[in-house]
């Protein structure tokens, strides 16, 4: 007799009742399950998505019930389950015993296949030795309780190590049937409907079985264990005990478990006991590894407090939000993401069902802070809410809805992960810029410390950097101050100074002066980040001809903004800074070959170097009264950079003492230069200058200036130079003779001969100021 589709359903379920979770709104059951707690499948092999409506107001919302069932419909394409009554709370013991019986009945190839699957899973979940601690934390997080307002209640977690066991207890929601079924199998999909969970396919939890041969759970009225020695007694065929739940009475527990179970507070709703295959103390380094890392709780949404108790020593770990800057972003799963999932599944890649229904992706960043300073992190890993072993080599934490491998060794080379990493780079650019959106929000240099270097790496780092670069070009992300106003500007509007003139450590020109002189519409980066290596690297990558500032631009400023530039460079300190910069950059020659009228004279005027004497200090001792006739380099500028200016001394005006002497003497009477020589010292000095003036082999061979104010030995101006003599003993005696009129002989002041005496003697003697020589 041919079987109907209903007969096939009955044959599959082999039970008069099924199980479902009750929803008070509209009064129905869903998440339909068989007597062993397994999800009922449709004829296409996928879990059935049906609602079984009932009329019963006494049931509790969210609780699982078992009820007698029936089927209405005409074919496998058109049927639905119905409730025939006999609604009761589930018999937890019976459900576990049914499941255990099903597993124990596996024979031959079924048993071998199950064992091989378990071995494969063990290999997949075997990563770093401490991975199982992560998974226990993950399970603590994934089902927090809610308060009366629907807000999540923070979860507290305890790890307790005793002689033989590692215990995990937490205050999250108690286990329900769905949770129990999930840990009794793999890929049951208990989290597929809850996209907020950080676990993703139930396999991670299986890591607790890698080094433990006994795992006990007490939660939500469930008491069960997974026990290798019970399932596989010596001499029996080996079975995959990790999926065989054993209903456990309190009398089945040893005193060590009972003691801890009785000691925990009532707010702890989940109790695990893990017995190590060798020595429970082997858990200690793994606990230390995980909880020595103060980053461990950053991305776990609901766990806020953990206690680790080893040998009665308590270590407390709290989520310190004051220490961390954490930013979450949500990306909608668009058509591109959906196509990636579709393509990955066509390739045969494992994509958890949770991701097939996910509508939004979370990308998060975190970094520590100390006051207003951001503190970059070292040796960071990529997070999938808990850390993987995959490095990204960035100074901050990155967390996202990646698909990791179950061992958390790294990220599989999936297009989904690459796409998220690309988008993460873009979101990082936005987050990074937001840290600078207001002045004094954070120390700007420390914000730039967050930037990774732009060099390549593995595929995930490359994707991240690619996404970052693409986004950073389009957003305002570089801080500037202009006209006293702080703001962010796009990179394309930031001046890329290749000259170093605006270098923050050796700034030649103040920002305000630069803007006032150059009239540039583009902006200089904030001085706090201008010399930061990451900023320099970014500018180098994104520089264009349009925003590059080179030495040609400096020349343009000097020539095209002449009035403003001259006003600025007339300041002595500015002039020194500008020359120091040109010399340091070895650009002085090339610049002054084009424009050079920015050399500061001692008079305060600006000149080209060929119009200025560089150093005539030794001559001005004698002819300082004619300084206005001798344009020279500003003394402070010259002396500050004397060594540097030697490299261009040929550019300055040459000082020829002989020509200067001739010019002054020629114009002496016409220009009334005598009025400048208004004391003995000046008169002495100028005569000395004339006497020693030389240019090569040439000397001054001209006359004395007419009406030159010579001073006699009494310090008075001599009115008749023809009566002026150099004093010697003969002349002195002669003047004393009684028959000699004293006015006939005037002796020139002896100061004229204090320096270079012979030269001055000779010079004056040749110009009719001799000694009185007796004629015989």
Protein language model annotation of sequence segments:
Residues 28-80:
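Acidic, low-complexity, intrinsically disordered interaction modules
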Residues 262-369:
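Glycine/threonine-rich ATP-lid/beta-loop region of ATP-binding domains
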Residues 71, 138, 161-163, 170-173, ...:
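Short, flexible loop/turn elements at secondary-structure junctions
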Residues 117, 148-153, 255, 266-274, ...:
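Amphipathic alpha-helical coiled-coil/helical-bundle segments that mediate oligomerization/assembly
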Residues 145, 176-179, 226-227, 281-283, ...:
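Short helix/loop capping segments that flank catalytic or ligand/cofactor-binding pockets
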Residues 86-109, 356-375, 385-387:
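Long, contiguous juxta-domain segments that are non-catalytic but functionally important
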Residues 7, 20-22:
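Structural detector for short beta-strands of small beta-barrel domains
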Residues 86-263:
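GHKL (Bergerat-fold) ATPase N-terminal catalytic module, capturing the glycine-rich phosphate-binding loop
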């Amino acid at each position: 007799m041919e079987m109907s589709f209903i007969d096939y359903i009955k044959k599959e379920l082999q039970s008069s009742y099924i199980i479902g979770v009750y929803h008070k709104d509209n009064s129905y059951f869903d998440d339909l399950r068989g007597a062993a707690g397994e999800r009922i499948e449709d004829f296409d092999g996928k879990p059935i998505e049906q609602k079984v409506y009932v009329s019963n107001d006494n049931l509790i919302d969210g609780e699982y019930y078992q009820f007698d069932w029936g089927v209405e419909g005409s074919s496998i394409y058109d049927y639905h389950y119905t409730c025939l009554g006999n609604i009761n709370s589930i018999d937890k013991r019976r459900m576990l015993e049914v499941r255990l019986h099903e597993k124990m009945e596996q024979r031959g190839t079924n048993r071998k296949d199950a064992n091989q699957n378990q071995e494969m899973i063990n290999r997949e979940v075997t990563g770093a030795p401490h991975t199982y601690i992560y998974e226990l934390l993950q399970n603590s997080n994934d089902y927090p309780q809610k308060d009366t307002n629907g807000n999540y209640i923070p979860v507290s977690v305890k790890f307790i190590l005793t002689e033989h066991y590692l215990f995990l207890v937490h205050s999250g929601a108690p286990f329900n049937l769905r949770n129990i079924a999930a840990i009794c199998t793999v890929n049951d999909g208990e989290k597929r409907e809850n996209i907020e969970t950080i676990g993703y396919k139930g396999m991670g939890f299986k890591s607790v079985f890698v080094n433990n041969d006994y795992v006990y759970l007490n939660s939500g009225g469930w008491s069960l264990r997974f026990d290798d020695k019970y399932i596989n007694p010596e001499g029996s065929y080996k079975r995959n005990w990790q999926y065989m739940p054993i209903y456990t009475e309190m009398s089945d527990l040893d005193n060590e478990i009972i003691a801890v179970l009785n000691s925990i507070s009532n707010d702890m709703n989940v109790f695990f006991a893990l017995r190590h295959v060798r020595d429970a103390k082997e858990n200690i380094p793994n606990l230390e590894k995980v909880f020595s890392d103060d980053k461990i709780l950053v991305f776990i949404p609901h766990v806020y407090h953990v206690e680790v108790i080893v040998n009665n020593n308590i270590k407390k770990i709290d989520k310190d939000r004051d220490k961390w800057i954490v930013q979450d972003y949500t990306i909608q799963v668009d058509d591109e993401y959906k196509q990636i999932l579709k393509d990955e599944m066509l390739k045969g890649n494992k994509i958890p069902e949770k991701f097939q229904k996910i509508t939004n992706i979370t990308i998060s960043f975190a970094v520590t802070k100390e006051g207003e300073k951001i503190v970059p992190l070292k040796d960071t890993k990529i997070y999938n809410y808990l850390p993987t072993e995959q490095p990204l080599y960035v100074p901050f934490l990155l967390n996202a809805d990646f698909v990791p491998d179950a061992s958390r060794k790294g990220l599989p080379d999936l297009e989904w992960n690459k796409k998220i990493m690309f988008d993460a780079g873009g979101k990082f650019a936005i987050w990074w810029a937001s840290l600078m959106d207001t002045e004094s929000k954070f120390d700007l240099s420390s914000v730039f410390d967050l930037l990774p270097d732009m060099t390549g790496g593995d595929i995930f780092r490359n994707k991240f950097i690619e996404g970052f670069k693409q986004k950073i070009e389009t957003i305002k992300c570089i801080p500037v101050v202009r006209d006293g106003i702080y703001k962010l500007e796009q990179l394309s509007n930031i001046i890329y100074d290749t000259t170093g003139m605006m270098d923050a450590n050796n700034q030649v020109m103040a920002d305000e002066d630069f803007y006032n002189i150059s009239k540039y519409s583009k902006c200089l980066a904030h001085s706090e980040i201008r010399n930061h290596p990451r900023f320099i690297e970014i500018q180098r990558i994104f520089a264009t001809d349009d925003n590059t500032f080179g030495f040609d631009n400096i020349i343009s400023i000097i020539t095209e903004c002449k009035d403003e530039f001259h006003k600025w460079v007339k300041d002595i300190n500015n002039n020194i800074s500008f020359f120091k910069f040109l010399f340091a950059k070895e650009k002085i020659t090339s610049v002054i070959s084009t424009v050079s009228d920015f050399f500061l004279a001692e008079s305060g005027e600006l000149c080209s170097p060929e119009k200025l004497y560089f150093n005539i200090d030794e001559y001005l001792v004698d002819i300082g009264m004619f300084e206005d006739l001798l344009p020279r380099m500003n003394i402070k500028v010259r002396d500050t950079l004397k060594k540097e200016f030697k490299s261009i001394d040929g550019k300055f005006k040459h000082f020829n003492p002989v020509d200067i002497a001739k010019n002054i003497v020629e114009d002496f009477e016409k220009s009334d230069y005598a009025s400048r020589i208004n004391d003995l010292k000046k008169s002495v000095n100028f005569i000395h200058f004339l006497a020693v003036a030389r240019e090569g082999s040439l000397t001054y061979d001209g006359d004395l200036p007419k009406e030159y104010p010579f001073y006699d030995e009494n310090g008075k101006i001599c009115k008749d130079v023809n009566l002026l003599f150099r004093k010697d003993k003969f002349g002195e005696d002669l003047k004393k003779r009684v028959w000699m009129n004293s006015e006939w002989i005037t002796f020139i002041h002896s100061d004229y001969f204090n320096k270079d005496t012979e030269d001055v003697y000779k010079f004056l003697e040749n110009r009719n100021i001799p000694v009185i020589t007796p004629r015989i």
